[in-house]
């Protein structure tokens, strides 16, 4: 379909091959991925391209704004906020 894009969303729990409308907002992709992988709602997640892991997508923009292509691999990653992850190893 011309208005749809097939993407591979990679997480630490595996990869999800799925199709979204090109007009889908990034935050809705993150929400769908969170539900698919059953990730805790407290965990802050961001989406980025596999080849540019430091350029996080803006959650309020859509796939079409980033020219996401069919078959593209996207990384869904957890954002660690300083102080949230305490080291309890001792």
What kind of region is each of these model predictions?
Residues 1-90:
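Ubiquitin system architectures
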């Amino acid at each position: 379909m011309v208005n749809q894009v097939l993407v591979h969303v990679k997480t630490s729990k595996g990869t999800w091959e799925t199709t979204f409308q090109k007009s889908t907002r990034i935050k809705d992709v993150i929400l769908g991925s969170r539900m698919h992988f059953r990730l805790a709602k407290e965990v802050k997640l961001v989406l980025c391209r596999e080849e540019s892991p430091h350029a996080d997508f803006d959650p309020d923009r859509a796939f079409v704004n980033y020219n996401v292509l069919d078959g593209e691999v996207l990384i869904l990653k957890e954002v660690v906020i300083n102080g949230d992850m305490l080291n309890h190893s001792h």
